[in-house]
Amino acid sequence: MKLRICELVINKTLITKTKIETILETKKKAIQNYAYILHDKDIYQNEKEAQLNGKKVGDIKAPHWHIYLRFNYSQDTKHISQWFNTQENFVSKIKGRFSDALMYMIHANRLDKHQYDEKEVVSNFDWKSEAQQDIFNRKYKMDARLKDILLKIHSGEIKEYNINDNINILENNIYATAIEKAFKFRIRDLKKKVRQMECIFITGLSGSGKSTLAKKIAEDKNYEAYISSGSNDILDDYCGEECIILDDLRSNCLGLSDLLKMLDNNTASSVKSRYKNKVLECQLIIITTVKSIDDFFEDIFRKDESIIQLKRRCKLHIKIDSKYIYYSVWNPIEMKYDLIEKKPNNLLNDFQIKSLSKKEAKDYIKSISNIDLDKDC
């Protein structure tokens, strides 16, 4: 039998340390690495083994050498036994990994046995570092694909909203726990960072194009947009999108504390959610509402609280009517919004929003219901 790595166990009475060193030196062209130790404090722990050797449990075993060899190329066990002048059955194939065998020299992986000092090991390489590194790699082994996924989660390239675009169902099943931990790690990391976020307040009558403009802004910025739900938990389905559109936001959906945190540009604060805290990592928040900014904020604040701090955070104010869009920017000196520009409201034209003709309406009804209104009943 040919082996690339092997172990020899030889009684101390059959070979001396000097002889071992001589053999290793003579065969150094064939032997890549070696490590050996004398076990002279082992005891019988198994009653059957002790009886077979005429001993009792607790008696000290005969001193013996453990010799571990790694060759440059495979060697026949017959020749190896001849080198050490021992029987071939004392040359054995290492079961498991070489690193485990190396740690067994000092019984590091068998705490029930006598623990030998690592200084008692004689070797021509850093056996301990190799063994520990191999054990570490196995314990925390990750394939290249998992590593790629985790690094992309940490960098923000993969988020909860686009996770299905980046992994398949098999990867999700295999790596689900690791992926969940990676998202939690990123959340903890985000809490430490300064958030670079802007806030836009858009107001106007229903049908004026507020939501359309909000979506257009997000699209033009290449942001994935989360549009808030109609429930009291407006962030129920938020999954890390770069833009949050609080569409047709009602003042009773948020308390002062949560609104301040949501618009806070200094930290990635957690915002109260019905099921769990949501960490806002968005770069843009857009509020749309039919109410003016003063009426909206006055509904939220108590009489003794100022709305200035929230106006200051909503630096861009956009007012829309059927004809024009008014763009204003917060003036921190005069504490008011300055009108910067008035532009024609072409939102409906730009997005080709129009009413259907009678024929188009009939065609639509037929397409979804298979009802042909031009046929007699």
Curated annotation (Swiss-Prot):
GO cellular component annotations of the record: extrachromosomal circular DNA
Top-level lineage group: Bacteria
Gene Ontology biological process terms in this record: DNA replication
Entry annotated with the keyword Isomerase: no
A Pfam family: Rep_OBD
GO-annotated molecular function: ATP binding; DNA binding; DNA topoisomerase activity; RNA binding; RNA helicase activity
Binding-site list for ATP: 204-211
Alphabetical list of InterPro entries matching this protein: Helicase_SF3_ssDNA/RNA_vir, P-loop_NTPase, Plasmid_rep_OBD
Keyword vocabulary terms for this entry: ATP-binding, DNA replication, Nucleotide-binding, Plasmid
Protein family per UniProt: Belongs to the Gram-positive plasmids replication protein type 2 family.
Entry function: Is essential for plasmid replication. Nicks the positive strand at the plus origin of replication.
Protein's UniProt name: Replication protein
Gene: rep
